[in-house]
Curated annotation (Swiss-Prot):
Topology within the bilayer: Single-pass type I membrane protein
Glycosylated residues (UniProt): N27, N54, N57, N68, N73, N79, N84, N108, N119, N143, N171, N178
InterPro entries: UL20
Species per Swiss-Prot/TrEMBL record: Human cytomegalovirus (strain Merlin) (HHV-5)
Family label: Belongs to the HHV-5 UL20 protein family.
Pfam families assigned: UL20
Membrane-spanning ranges: 224-244
Name under which the protein is recorded: Membrane protein UL20
Ranges facing Lumenal side: 26-223
Coiled coil regions, renumbered to chain: none
Highest taxon above the source species: Viruses
Disulphide bridges: none
Any single Gene Ontology cellular-component annotation: host cell endoplasmic reticulum membrane
Entry's localization field: Host endoplasmic reticulum membrane
Length: 338
């Protein structure tokens, strides 16, 4: 697992470098959008990006609501985050909820909002939060050394993304930060080549991809643990069964039917066995018969001799032919003349 994480970190770094080399700087204005995304397990993602200044003509089509900015001085804070908002006014649940704010940082009188991630009846802190985001954006654009970099910050329970210093249209912004499915807007296409490996824009589609990947990785790891545990239990059970059979049945894996373990030799019998001589062994029954299965083998039915065959009838008995008689003694007769 450590090797996989190290590889992902390297890919994240490569992806960020790839993104930073593909963009060009646009003429930025003080008009920005700020997004707030909440989801399951306390996930909070915020994003800040530039916006074309002609967005006022499109607020009606998307249902944005205009609200007057309350008099708030944000200069006391240098690093505003969702902790500056009223926590009870942030809507959190088991599903993803988004809110998009639009404002002109040069006009501290009005802002527009769309979405349900924040309860806008809590107007005490929202104005200061948005003015703090304006301050962060100006600092990001003015002090950035490379205009083709992405800044991702982890602030405790919040992930904040400072987008490339470009200007995005309202259509693309709403589609990327409010829709979980659909085609990727062309303006955000540079960010999505390897989005499962890095949080670059804190968008809704990106959050779905990341969280689904993490969920699948978790299920895969749990499945591996379950399979490993099951295999281990099976192996331990088989090992115990083999050991029981080994010690219970005299080193046999399967006990014969009807077999009873004979008692082991006593110390006295062991001593007597040591005193046996060669002549005694020739006469004795095989040594250590109690440890062998000789008694069981001899008494088993498979070793009983079959009954003898009946005698053959006399007429079928064939006797071998008798040998020819030996010739009689031969006598020599000698005739003498008279």
């Amino acid at each position: 697992m450590l090797g996989i994480r190290a590889m992902l970190v390297m890919l994240d770094y490569y992806w960020i470098q790839l993104i930073t080399n593909n963009g060009t700087r646009s003429n930025n204005t003080d008009t920005i959008f700020v997004s707030l995304l909440t989801g399951p397990n306390g996930v909070t993602r915020t994003a800040i990006g530039g916006l074309y200044s002609n967005y006022t003509n499109l607020t009606g089509a998307f249902g944005f609501t205009s609200t007057n900015m309350s008099a708030t001085n944000s200069s006391a804070e240098d690093n505003w985050s969702v902790t500056n908002l009223t926590e009870s006014c942030i809507n959190r649940g088991e599903s993803y909820v988004t809110t998009i704010w639009l404002l002109d940082c040069t006009k501290n009188d009005t802002y527009w909002y769309y979405g349900n991630a924040y309860n806008h009846t809590c107007e005490g802190t929202i104005s200061g939060y948005l003015l703090g985001m304006c301050k962060l954006w100006k600092s990001w654009v003015n002090n950035i050394t490379s205009y083709n970099t992405v800044r991702v910050e982890s602030l405790g329970n919040e992930t904040r993304c400072m987008l490339l210093p470009r200007q995005y249209t309202l259509n693309a912004t709403v589609e990327w930060y409010n829709k979980s499915e659909g085609d990727v807007p062309e303006e955000f296409m540079d960010y999505v080549i390897l989005t499962p490996l890095a949080v670059l824009t804190c968008g809704l589609q990106e959050a779905y991809i990341l969280d689904k990947g993490r969920r699948y990785m978790y299920l895969f790891s749990v499945s591996c643990v379950g399979i490993t545990g099951t295999v281990s239990i099976i192996l331990v059970s088989l090992s115990l069964l083999i050991l029981i059979c080994y010690y219970r049945c005299g080193r046999l894996l399967i006990c014969p039917r009807g077999f009873e373990l004979l008692p082991e030799f006593t110390e006295e019998e062991e001593e007597k066995e040591k005193l046996l001589t060669h002549n005694d062994i020739e006469v004795q029954v095989p040594i250590r018969t109690r440890r062998l299965l000789v008694p069981w083998i001899r008494e088993s039915k498979m070793w009983v001799l079959p009954p003898p065959l009946p005698p053959r009838p006399p007429h079928l008995i064939e006797f071998p032919p008798s040998p020819p008689p030996s010739p009689g003694p031969m006598h020599m007769v000698v005739c003498m003349p008279a």
